[in-house]
Design a protein with these regions (language model features):
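Bacterial N-terminal signal peptides that target proteins for export
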Residues: 2-15
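Short terminal (N- or C-terminal) low-complexity/amphipathic segments
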Residues: 6, 26-27
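Bacterial N-terminal signal peptides
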Residues: 12-26
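Eukaryotic scaffold repeat domains enriched in small/polar residues
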Residues: 13, 34-377
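Bacterial lipoprotein signal-peptidase II cleavage site
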Residues: 29-32
Length: 377
């Protein structure tokens, strides 16, 4: 899918403009935590969403996709549990993580489960392979690197397990682990609810750490070399430039710039690989998932923006859904709206993780126990 368009940001008040490498960027904003409510609890409906939020996230863009349909065929009556992780591999197959048929996140869904949480499908949804039972407490996101290796972040903690990142080959053999099993902390060899991995073209490994909501929780990016040797870290809990509040998702563009979905701050922050700040984008909504394809088409899933009172998930004027644009200049061209009402509840709905296949069809991994495929019209 080719996107040719200019940056489309609406800015108000005293929001500043940065012009960075020919890119117009909007500055500002905030995020929610996963609810323990059941999937049947939809967000409460409020008023109709406006054309755009104060931070520039548009709700009135064209939607070139058919309505999402449930996707993925399991044997033996198994059904999707909560999920936030899905990725396309170099061969076009789709990899996903499943929290072992259970509902919720950051819990102990897979601890003691006989189910495999790492799953490979073809694009029709046929299950090709699964593995990983007994390894995870609560898998969060999955990444496929350019060599086809798989990276899974486990942000659960139970009985001496969890709080690690695993690297697998496609047969499920463990090639590397990062972090200490069952240990959560701020050290250079520990994580506190790691969320996702991104692998640079040279093999350097970047881990978003972490998902914690406490004031002293980790909120940083950790960098390792291709062998797992720690190199550096940057970021802390906060709202300033280079600070994070739930760095929830990572992606690289073709220039090797690192995109960090700083979810609780309702923004994407962009850095070079040494942690130097490049830009801040708020026009894509509240980023639960970010995927960038080889043509620098960027797909951003917003599963939590809400109206109502300030607090977790508060992002007034921004409707949930998938925004699609250009990673080169930050322009947003398309919007696939979440079918849930424009609500005041912080419950997650719609895609929390996403990827796209080679023709541009989208696969959205949902906290509410499903994966949906969105086919281009």
């Amino acid at each position: 899918m080719s996107l040719r368009h200019s940056a489309n940001c609406i800015l108000i008040g005293s929001i500043s403009l940065f012009i960075v490498i020919g890119t117009i960027v909007a500055i500002g904003a905030s995020e929610p935590a996963q609810s323990s409510a059941t999937p049947a609890n939809a967000p409460a409906q409020t008023q109709q969403a406006p054309p755009a939020s104060p931070l520039g996230a548009r709700n009135d863009l064209p939607n070139p996709y058919l309505a999402g349909v449930s996707w993925g065929q399991f044997p033996g009556g198994r059904k999707w549990g909560s999920t936030a992780g899905i990725a396309v591999g170099p061969d076009g197959n789709i990899w996903a993580i499943d929290r072992c048929g259970a509902f919720g996140s950051r819990g102990t869904n897979c601890a003691g489960s006989p189910l495999d949480p790492v799953l490979e499908f073809d694009t029709s949804g046929k299950l090709l392979k699964s593995f990983g039972k007994g390894l995870f407490v609560s898998p969060h996101k999955i990444t496929v690197d350019r060599d086809g290796n798989l990276w899974v972040a486990d942000n659960g903690l139970k009985d001496g397990n969890g709080q690690q990142v695993f690297k697998f080959d496609q047969n499920g053999n463990i090639l590397m682990t990062l972090g200490k099993a069952g240990v959560s902390g701020p050290g250079l060899d520990t994580f506190d609810q790691p969320t996702e991995v991104a692998v640079a073209p040279n093999g350097d490994i970047f881990v978003a750490d972490g998902h914690g909501e406490q004031p002293n929780a980790n909120a940083r990016i950790m960098k390792f070399d291709s062998h797992g040797k720690f190199l550096k870290t940057w970021g802390k809990k906060g709202t300033g430039i280079g600070e994070f509040d739930c760095p929830h998702t990572l992606a690289f563009d073709s220039q090797g710039r690192l995109f960090v979905g700083d979810r609780q701050n309702n923004r994407i922050q962009i850095f070079d690989q040494e942690g130097r700040f490049i830009a801040e984008w708020k026009q894509f909504g509240r980023p639960s998932g970010v995927y960038i394809d080889k043509n620098d088409v960027i797909y951003v899933a917003d599963s939590e923006s809400r109206e109502g009172k300030p607090g977790y998930g508060y992002n007034p004027g921004c409707r949930r859904g998938i925004r699609i644009g250009s990673a080169k200049d930050g322009s947003v061209k398309y919007f696939v709206p979440d079918p849930a009402p424009y609500g005041a509840s912080a419950d997650s709905t719609g895609s929390e993780g996403l990827t796209a296949d080679f023709p541009g069809n989208i696969y959205g991994a949902e906290y509410t126990m499903d994966v949906k495929k969105y086919i281009r019209k």
